[in-house]
Amino acid sequence: MTLFTVSCLLVVLFLCHSLVHAENNGYYGYTPTVANYLPEKPQNIMNPVDSCWRLKSDWAANRKDLADCVVGFGSSTLGGKKGNLYVVTNPYDNAQNPQPGSLRYGVIQAKPLWITFAKDMVITLENELMVNSYKTIDGRGAKVEIAYGPCITIQDVTNVIVHGISIHDCKPGKYGMVRSSPTHVGHRKGSDGDAIAIFGSSNIWIDHCYLASCTDGLIDVIHASTGITISNNYFTQHDKVMLLGHNDDFVQDVKMKVTVAFNHFGPGLVERMPRVRRGYAHVANNRYDKWIMYAIGGSADPTIFSEGNYFIASDKSNSKEVTKREVKGGWNNWRWRTSKDVFKNGAYFVPSGYGSISLPYSSAQRFTVAPGNLVPSLTADAGPLNCNRNGPCY
């Protein structure tokens, strides 16, 4: 067999893998464009989060083991691990008086719950979904979409896991009454139309979700939220993708620590992957496919460590730079560093700052970051997985 024949076979296999994965995970008629770059290693290597649980055929009987697999700043997140299972049996929603069997009824409870789904469903929420502390929303084993209405709000709570669901076409919430616990219904002034908005919360993990086409952002982490890990997600077809930090004047965001790892920032994304203010962002082993404006940006002196990412620049000559500082000057001392990153199609990263940028991870938070050339394999299954209850998740 000639070298040319082997190369052709590799191209065909990679294309098939990408298209099948997109279809299996319900990318709603949109097939992600496969970049014209072959992965630089085989397709059988998993990242540290996935290797912790995905190959176990008994995952459905031991769902809560997932909580042991989070890495990075959100590694202490328990979700509903210490609670009972709650099964969503129907997609119907009532913002003020949710009924048993609905998603909203589960997420507002005061006790820990691990929430699963009895069947495939599309949930269109009446108003924003207020998630209480110690909850896991676990979509494995079903195709679950939250779409075409307001979406998820995580506000002033702790220990929330959102895993394996698709969140897209989110709309602004309405002014009105929304229940946030069994004993409290409060006035809401209307949400912005984010897929997931995280306010003043800690120990949050967003993993293996599909996020696209919302009115405002896909993920916002603001108001001094910290202890956040955003991993294994597939982002596509959106403008302002991920905001970390409320505004330049909100000094409390200096405590914010966020890990962004093993995500696939796919086609049709414009900017903010992420955009950071004041806090610390570890951006590691992510794949970026042809952003339109920039990939990683920020203002107000954030610390950004870009490690082992795989950047494929747009074909446009004015969109090659990975980074963007949202000020005209004074950013030379901001600590923005790159290590082990791979740059394709003319992509480049402009570093800045002096002194150490060592990761402030505890031993429990620390994980191995691979060289950037391995990222196409490590992110190949970003987004919701195809999980059969009687076998491993693919």
UniProtKB/Swiss-Prot annotation:
Cofactor, how bound (note): Binds 1 Ca(2+) ion. Required for its activity.
A Pfam family of this chain: Pectate_lyase_4
GO molecular function, one term: metal ion binding
Pathway connected to this protein: Glycan metabolism; pectin degradation; 2-dehydro-3-deoxy-D-gluconate from pectin: step 2/5
List of residues binding Ca(2+): 192, 216, 220
Catalytic activity as recorded in UniProt: Eliminative cleavage of (1->4)-alpha-D-galacturonan to give oligosaccharides with 4-deoxy-alpha-D-galact-4-enuronosyl groups at their non-reducing ends
PANTHER family in the cross-refs: PECTATE LYASE 16-RELATED, PECTATE LYASE 18-RELATED
The protein's name in its UniProt record: Probable pectate lyase 16
